[in-house]
Regions:
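N-terminal loops that bind phosphate or other acidic moieties
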Residues: 1-64, 68-133
């Protein structure tokens, strides 16, 4: 079994840093999570250059990105052709906490599948009585 040695959090703006800070408020320190921020004016190759040394230094990783079809995903997809990394889109707070807590319980590819399977359960519509019309 090849576990995810690292969790990569790669998003637009500072979302990844703030998401990690919020997760740590709930679950404690997440030393296994490294954040990467795509900032205005940054080229995809700049982001790739920041992430690649981390991937080169670990046995396997899971990368959590914010949205499908944009630069963070595209960069991680390119890197996944060279390194053992599973890329998951749609990162949210419950997913990050689950990734950190389950990282050593399953293979890095299984972890990616597990994280995607939990997406439907992380959103709910709550209607309070006062909202009725």
């Amino acid at each position: 079994m090849q576990i995810a040695e690292k969790i990569i959090l790669c998003t637009h703006g500072y979302f990844s840093e703030k998401l990690k800070e919020s997760a740590e408020m709930i679950a404690g320190p997440m030393d296994d999570v490294t954040t990467f921020c795509l900032l205005p004016g940054m080229e995809p190759d700049d982001l790739k250059g920041q992430i690649e040394p981390l991937l080169a230094s670990c046995s396997a990783a899971v990368a959590l990105v914010d949205i499908a079809g944009d630069t963070p995903l595209n960069v991680m997809a390119r890197l996944s052709a060279q390194y053992p990394v599973t890329v998951v889109t749609g990162v949210n707070l419950p997913m990050l906490i689950e990734a950190s807590e389950s990282r050593t319980d399953m293979d890095y590819q299984e972890l990616g599948t597990h994280l995607v399977s939990m997406l439907p359960s992380t959103g709910r519509v709550i209607q309070m009585k006062g909202a009725e019309k």
